[in-house]
């Protein structure tokens, strides 16, 4: 018999700023770099710039998206085109990326900024997949539908 009052519930704070984003991204990329679907496309992160070179750029990106920090300039499309030329990205890559992102956010944070991080990630994944492949992605649509975003 389970006593609901005795079962601890974890309450998470919302993403509050750069330090939280750094922690989130380090955890997320730690998972992505060993994932059986995502590790190959992320080889360049691992081998060329390393995680320590990649994280500040991605932290700038997400801090700009979530907090309007104005730190990220440019477009992520050229980098993804290079990856796509080397390792063709398919719907499964974007669906796994989003699933991993949403799970990582949900395990670490909760609140309106966290929700925005998930909805923006879904929007970016859908748009990037469409730009790279010219196709819709039913698998990604299914992730969005089931991920409460």
Labelled PLM ranges:
Residues 1-149:
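Core of compact, soluble alpha-helical bundle domains
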